[in-house]
From Swiss-Prot:
Keywords for the protein's UniProt record, in alphabetical order: PQQ biosynthesis, Transport
Keyword S-adenosyl-L-methionine (UniProt): no
HAMAP family attached to this UniProt entry: PQQ_syn_PqqB
CDD domains, alphabetized: PQQB-like_MBL-fold
Gene Ontology biological process terms from the UniProt entry: pyrroloquinoline quinone biosynthetic process
Protein family per UniProt: Belongs to the PqqB family.
Upper taxonomic lineage: Bacteria, Pseudomonadati, Pseudomonadota, Gammaproteobacteria, Moraxellales
Its job: May be involved in the transport of PQQ or its precursor to the periplasm.
Cystine crosslinks: none
Protein name: Coenzyme PQQ synthesis protein B
Pathway: Cofactor biosynthesis; pyrroloquinoline quinone biosynthesis
Length: 303
């Protein structure tokens, strides 16, 4: 399985266009050791030619420009992207579908709850239905594994997780099964497994066992502390209120990751306020010392 990190930041990217927090100001002026990052999305493939997007970020045009393998150039209009899987209906994971309209008809896999959001509050399916066949909806049963034509060795097993529907959703404060999923992706040829959960509000015993059984875990790294948005003065909500588990301290994701013998542990969906973006920070050093990597745009993993 080929895994390519198209974007590794949370909503707004890094630096966020209107933000002057220490991180955003520092990367903009070159005064901190940090990489510019686009909004989170990854691509996976079993042959290096045909690819599946996991989430479609607002930055998808630039991401695909930087990802040369996505353009095999076999004909006048071409792409290696044949399918999109949505983990949720968050704007930073779905607005890229509008940019992909020239590639319609496009196969889009999501749960019924996500489809409801994307036909009402943010009706992107409706908007594009007259655009050369539009978005072709494939329903994900959040309790059942599925396969995708053309990717015969890959099996996708959804996992219902605790997080939150987007602010525009009518059930933002009324959680439903299928609002958010993680994915266990198994490559039956290499016998390797990826666990992907860019939006993760809680780690329970089931998730711990799945992560232990995986060869690579790539999970939510939005915030270093639960009150980070408040402490930096850019927001009023805690991470948990937004559906994101913080990294540090008791009950943080790092305390769980440190219990795993999983070969590769990666944090993705990193907010612009998070000190781990500064590669000279104590927080970045702590992750490195514990064998946890910080995802960056262009990162490649082979399983």
């Amino acid at each position: 399985m080929h895994i390519y990190i198209l974007g590794s930041a949370a909503g707004g990217g890094f630096p966020q266009w209107n933000c002057n927090c220490p991180n955003c100001h520092g990367v903009r002026t070159g005064t901190i050791n940090a990489k510019v990052r686009t909004q989170s999305s990854i691509a996976i493939s079993e042959n290096g030619v045909d690819w599946i997007l996991l989430n479609a970020s607002p930055d998808i045009r630039q991401q695909l420009f930087d990802f040369k393998a996505a353009q095999p150039a076999r004909k006048l209009r071409d792409t290696g992207i044949t399918n999109v899987i949505l983990m949720d209906s968050q704007l930073d994971h779905t607005t890229g579908l509008l940019t992909l309209r020239e590639g319609c008809p496009m196969n889009v896999w999501c749960t019924e709850m996500v489809y409801q959001d994307l036909t009402t509050g943010f009706p992107v399916f409706n908007m594009l239905k007259h655009w050369n066949g539009g978005l072709q909806y494939h329903q994900i049963d959040p309790k059942q594994a599925f396969k995708i034509n053309g990717f015969e060795n890959l099996e996708f097993l959804p996992l219902i997780i605790q997080s939150a529907a987007p602010p525009y959703s009518p059930h933002r404060h009324d959680p439903h099964e299928g609002d958010n999923i993680a994915l266990i992706i198994k490559d039956h040829k290499t016998q390797k497994q990826l666990f992907y959960a860019p939006g993760l509000g809680k780690i329970d015993d089931q998730i711990m066992q799945i992560m232990q059984d995986s060869d690579c875990v790539m999970i939510d790294g939005t915030l270093w502390t639960d009150d980070e948005m408040q402490q930096t003065g850019v927001g009023k909500k805690t991470g948990r209120e937004m559906g994101h588990l913080y990294i540090s301290g008791e009950g943080g994701s790092l305390s769980y990751l440190n219990q795993l013998s999983t070969p590769k542990k990666v944090l993705i969906h990193i907010n612009n306020t998070n000190p781990i973006l500064n590669e000279n920070s104590a927080q970045f050093a702590e992750l490195k010392a514990n064998g946890v990597e910080v995802a960056f745009d262009g990162m490649q993993i082979e399983l």
